[in-house]
Amino acid sequence: MGSYEDKYIQWTMLRQQRDQDVHELTNLFHTLCIKLGIKYSEKHLVLKYRSCLHRYIQEEMEFLDISSLGTTYRYAAKIEQKFKQKKQDFGSANQK
């Protein structure tokens, strides 16, 4: 990572990439938070983190009232795992 400005731009544009899992995104999120000295409230960090996730994860979490970043991460990881399992089950069903 380059200068402070580069890191800040990366923070503002942070989104989960196509082949990036929740764990990788979370590590990058925390790394940027620390390096930039982000001092948002927990609620604002939760909102920022949720906005970075894939749309299907955001939609699954839409009606959950989560105020903890750790809880948000655990839900996102579970939703991602459930989605991957469904995708895998669908793929194996089509091969029969």
Where are each of the predicted segments found?
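Positively charged, low-complexity alpha-helical assembly interface
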Residues: 2-96
